């Protein structure tokens, strides 16, 4: 959003207030507010253009803090999340930022201006989207300097939120949701379908064992042509495949 004028800022605040008020009922509630999409790819997903990372994060933090303050008027238990791709210490796309640098700035800015409870929404796809065997991700290591964070090395996120300097007020762990994740089946051949299920099972065992990872949301219910790779739990919902369940459906 444009946070540089009073009018545009008030319009954004009004939209947030409308949503927060409408969806704060026990029967119809937004509990998790993910602020924008894959902000490390802000040059593609927002309207700011190619900006220095500090300029981008200053605007982003104001957007997130505004959402936090407004929704907490209606629901003290709601959470706001910074959304990022599977890049960590590498720009995951042309003109993108490094996620670790963005999180460092989040810490610096929020503590300087007053800390608040923001959380992490990670898109922990395999480093190569077309390869469901995430354990083969050579660029995903267990070092805090790893290039990518995927289902292979979720321990990096778990360790990051366990460090006191990254915690809310120094002692409260921030939430981590894998808010858009999944493995693909490169084809509908049996081996590819089994590899997709195995890739998820591999990741799930890690999620289940790591206290710092709260949960996972799968990318897509069905395969979709617009995704580039078949990431669904079920096959294409066309006349040929009719949304037939893939092995990963049962695993999930």
Segments (PLM) and residue ranges:
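Short alpha-helical functional segments enriched in proximate histidine and acidic residues
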Residues: 22, 70, 206
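A generic structural signal for solvent-exposed, polar alpha-helical segments
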Residues: 18, 39, 102, 131, ...
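Glycine-rich anion/phosphate-binding loops
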Residues: 5-20
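Outer-membrane beta-barrel translocator domains and adjoining extracellular loop/strand segments
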Residues: 46-47, 134
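Glycine-rich, acidic and aromatic/proline-enriched surface loops and short helix-turn segments
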Residues: 22-25, 163
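Glycine-centered flexibility motif
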Residues: 5, 83, 182, 231-234
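Aromatic-rich peripheral "rim/lid" segments of glycoside hydrolase catalytic domains that contact
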Residues: 1, 11, 25-29, 34, ...
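Noncatalytic carbohydrate-binding groove/subsite architecture in carbohydrate-active enzymes
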Residues: 9-13, 29-31, 55-190
């Amino acid at each position: 959003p444009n946070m540089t004028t009073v009018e545009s800022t008030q319009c954004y605040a009004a939209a947030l207030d409308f949503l927060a008020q409408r969806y704060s009922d026990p029967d119809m509630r937004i509990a998790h507010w993910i602020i924008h999409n894959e902000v490390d790819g802000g040059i593609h997903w927002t309207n700011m253009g190619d900006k220095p990372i500090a300029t981008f994060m200053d605007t982003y933090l104001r957007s997130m803090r505004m959402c936090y303050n407004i929704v907490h008027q209606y629901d003290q238990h709601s959470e706001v999340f910074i959304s990022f791709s599977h890049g960590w210490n590498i720009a995951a796309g042309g003109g993108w930022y490094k996620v670790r640098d963005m999180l460092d700035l989040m810490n610096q800015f929020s503590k300087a201006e007053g800390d608040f409870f923001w959380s992490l929404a990670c898109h922990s796809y395999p480093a190569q989207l077309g390869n469901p065997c995430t354990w083969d991700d050579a660029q995903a290591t267990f070092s805090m300097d790893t290039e990518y964070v995927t289902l292979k090395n979720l321990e990096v996120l778990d360790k990051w939120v366990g460090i006191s300097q990254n915690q809310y007020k120094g002692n409260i762990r921030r939430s981590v949701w894998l808010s858009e994740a999944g493995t693909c089946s490169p084809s509908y051949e049996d081996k590819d379908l089994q590899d997709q299920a195995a890739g998820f099972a591999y990741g799930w065992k890690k999620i289940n064992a790591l206290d710092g990872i709260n949960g996972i949301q799968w990318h897509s219910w069905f395969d979709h042509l617009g995704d580039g790779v078949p990431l669904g739990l079920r096959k294409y919902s066309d006349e040929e495949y009719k949304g037939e369940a893939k092995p990963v459906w049962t695993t999930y």
